[in-house]
A protein has these predicted regions:
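Hydrophobic alpha-helical membrane-insertion signals
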Residues: 1-29
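Generic alpha-helical segment signature
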Residues: 11, 24, 37, 58, ...
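Short, solvent-exposed coil/turn linker segments
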Residues: 17, 35-39, 95, 185, ...
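Basic, short loop/linker segments at the boundary and entry of helix-turn-helix/winged-helix-like folds
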Residues: 24-67, 72-73, 380, 384
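Anion-binding and metal-coordination hotspots
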Residues: 66, 73-86, 96-485
Length: 485
């Protein structure tokens, strides 16, 4: 039967409770119940005057507003405020009633600029929520997955300028330099000159070398990232670590043009002391410096197979066998490549004899050198890379590496698809750190809240079942006693 009463209740006056308007299984309700939000007062206490000025907005409400934005992937703060005005669940979560005025969309931005800009407040919020996850024994940091994703910056690709910038130094450069000098001394070679005294251009792997790069005039702190063969954008690189259950353990933010292997140390320092036994990462982290760092710290590095960067039709490096006793390489034609020098990048160079190679039947498959000399390089920390290869072939490691798509890659996919992580509307690295910190806090807290809610439901079911069984047993015993008498 057709019923037409859509407009009858619009002007009714009703009495209701805000708490009754939000379903018991609503996401914001279980999130609000999962954690005590009063910890925010302790974090921001020193940012407010205790007895001067006008009464401020509640700091918990202030933090919850961007929390709603990142939790539901709302594109801007302006749109978030519009959603809060008409959404009862949002108002309930913020502690507002139906007649309270919603803060202006610039309120959070002004408070950020005046109070939170140069602080680590949002990282502390992320850490506090992670501690709650540890408290319930949900996090297992023995196997950690590390990867980086790029978030598009709010910068026009056409508004740029070229600048000369110094390349960031490798985090292990000082240790590598000592190792190079030690190796050259063992081979009776002179130590390398300092860069200031060297007439040659510094090597590409060392810090201090200058290079021309593209810089955005809108967001100079972002980096020019080559997204594909025909696509380049200004972006930020978000390096992230998570455990095998998908709990986010730490993160760092860098310009999009920084390589993952150069920025790894910052993330690794944040993860120190949590009990990592195995660290799983993609081929971008498969460098001797990282392998040495992990193995020396007692951590098992798990890296994938990396295809040799050799021209098609030429012998790959594995065809040249290294003789550890005589410190030389033997080519496929059983000729010796002897040690020549150790370069500034930490690679020992081994060269063949040009006169012998000139008559070699494999010359065209070996080298294109005009003087017929074959060059093979070996890093001073090559034994660490060989250990990584042995680990890769260990039973069970292939299956463990395959879990990346179920952990760190799924995490990135969820953040981009549902939490506005594909791009940022904010300018500057500091604001990007705020966005990443709150987004990852949302992901961890949402997962924690759902698991706690499921545990409560399970406990209530078990409690009801136990009471039912106890009642049945009591009735059974009573009937037996009555029958006996």
């Amino acid at each position: 039967m057709l019923t037409k009463d859509a407009d009858k209740k619009r002007e009714q006056i009703q009495l209701f409770c805000m708490d009754d308007m939000v379903p018991q299984d609503h996401l914001l309700r279980i999130i609000d119940k999962a954690i005590d939000w009063s910890f925010i007062y302790e974090l921001v206490e020193e940012k407010y005057s205790p007895d001067q000025g006008r009464p401020s907005m509640d700091p918990v409400t202030l933090i919850k507003i961007p929390f709603i934005q990142y939790l539901y992937g709302i594109k801007s703060m302006r749109q978030t405020i519009k959603e809060i005005e008409v959404n009862v669940a949002y108002r309930w979560f913020l502690g507002l009633d139906m007649f309270d005025k919603v803060p202006h969309f610039t309120t959070f931005g002004k408070n950020y600029t005046r109070r939170f800009k140069d602080t680590d407040l949002f990282e502390q919020i992320f850490t506090k929520i992670l501690e709650e996850c540890y408290k319930f024994k949900l996090v297992d940091p023995t196997e950690v997955f590390v990867d980086a994703t790029h978030v598009k910056a709010k910068a026009n690709n056409k508004k740029m300028q070229k600048r000369i910038a110094k390349q960031e130094a490798l985090f292990y450069e000082d240790i590598l330099r000592k190792e190079i000098d030690k190796d050259r001394d063992a081979h009776e070679k002179k130590p390398l000159k300092d860069k200031d005294d060297d007439d040659h251009k510094p090597s590409s792997g060392s810090g201090g070398s200058e290079k021309e790069e593209k810089s955005s005039t809108t967001d100079p702190e972002s980096g020019w990232f080559h997204k594909g063969e025909h696509k380049s954008v200004f972006a930020y690189s978000v390096q992230t670590a998570c455990d095998k259950n998908g709990w986010i353990l730490g993160y760092t933010i860098n310009p999009g043009n920084y390589h993952d292997s150069r920025t790894f140390k910052g993330l690794y320092d944040k993860l120190s002391g949590i009990g990592i036994k195995t660290l799983i990462a993609d081929a971008g982290y498969k460098v001797p410096g990282i392998a040495k760092l992990l193995i020396d710290d007692g951590i098992t590095p798990l890296f994938p197979y990396k295809r040799p960067q050799t021209k098609e039709g030429f012998f790959q490096k594995w065809r040249y066998v290294y003789d550890e006793y005589y410190d030389c390489y033997i080519c496929p034609n059983d000729q010796v490549l002897r040690y020549v020098t150790t370069n500034r990048n930490g690679y020992k160079e081994y060269k063949s004899c040009g006169t012998v190679c000139a008559t070699c039947p494999y010359l065209r498959e070996c080298t294109e050198s005009k003087d017929h000399v074959k060059l093979v390089t070996r890093h001073v920390w090559e034994e660490y890379m060989e250990k990584c290869e042995d680990i890769r072939h260990t039973i069970g490691m292939k299956e463990l590496y395959a879990q990346r798509k179920e952990t760190i890659e799924r995490l990135f996919g969820t953040a981009k698809e549902h939490h506005g992580f594909r791009y940022t509307q904010m300018i500057g690295k500091a604001r990007m750190e705020m966005k990443v910190g709150l987004t990852y806090a949302c992901l961890n807290l949402k997962k924690l809240a759902k698991m706690k809610h499921q545990r409560e439901l399970l406990n209530s079911v078990i409690s009801c079942f136990n009471s039912f069984i106890a009642t049945k047993i009591h009735i059974k015993r009573k009937s037996v006693l009555e029958f006996a008498f």
